[in-house]
Curated annotation (Swiss-Prot):
Gene3D superfamilies: 2-enoyl-CoA Hydratase, Chain A, domain 1. It is found in: Cytoplasm. Residues 34-289 form the CoA carboxyltransferase N-terminal domain. Its EC number is 2.1.3.15. It catalyses: N(6)-carboxybiotinyl-L-lysyl-[protein] + acetyl-CoA = N(6)-biotinyl-L-lysyl-[protein] + malonyl-CoA. The lineage of its organism: Bacteria, Bacillati, Bacillota, Clostridia, Eubacteriales. It comes from Clostridium botulinum (strain Hall / ATCC 3502 / NCTC 13319 / Type A). GO terms for cellular component: acetyl-CoA carboxylase complex. A zinc finger (C4-type) spans 38-60. This is Acetyl-coenzyme A carboxylase carboxyl transferase subunit beta. Component of the acetyl coenzyme A carboxylase (ACC) complex. Biotin carboxylase (BC) catalyzes the carboxylation of biotin on its carrier protein (BCCP) and then the CO(2) group is transferred by the transcarboxylase to acetyl-CoA to form malonyl-CoA.
Amino acid sequence: MLKNLFRKTKYITVSQKNIENYKRENTPTIPDGMWVKCNKCGEILYQNDLEKNYMVCNLCGNHFRIGVKERIKYLFDKDTFKEWDYKIKTENPLDFKGYDEKIEHIKEKTNLSEAVTTGKCKIAGMEVVVCIMDSKFMMGSMGSVVGEKITRAIERAIGLRLPVIIFTASGGARMQEGILSLMQMAKVSSALAKLDEEGLLYICVLTDPTTGGVTASFAMLGDIILAEPDALIGFAGKRVIEQTINEKLPEDFQKSEFLLEHGFIDKIVPRSDLRKVLAKLINMHQNSF
């Protein structure tokens, strides 16, 4: 009996490689991109359901940032969008180090030519000129090409006697182009002044984020200014302002709800209602075109 008590215990050696193989074989395979975490409430959302709901969380109403393709799909009549000026090439006028390489990398990554896409389309059968900014392209920053494309679109709208809708999503002027990027603020604003003189409608839809030079120029010049819920809209950053004035700002400062309350915008429109609201506004102003 004592002999059996001190006998060496038998065991099986399992290598780390065998454990990894077991885990790999017994772990369910889930394709990438099927599930998305809401950055507001933390809920895990099924990608297909999220897309059907206009990229809006069905629990907390958080509006995910969307790009050009999604806006065209959700808002405009099918197969009516005709893009303009997509061949305009971004230059490096200041020979800013690494700028050319960065632009080419972002072009490949996003499949976009620049931070704004312009063109003509139809909403509920009515023709409009649209400019759609995309924050995925260098945070939607406004450089020479962005200003030129928006200006050309406005000038064409004047010639065609069509209303203009601009969807803003930008971090402001593009620092790599220096004063040339800041000049676009005046350039686009001047084109919008001509549009106004012609009695044509300009609707601006502010989306998250709309900041810097874009906010300080054409984003706030709309005849009608709409915004998506909970969108960040401002000029300088909240912390910069707090440090400058030595005061604590409200929690919802620079949010679309705060701007509506203080009279800076006309209406907050959920993404699911935006097509209907835009169609109604354009239809109301048809006689002025």
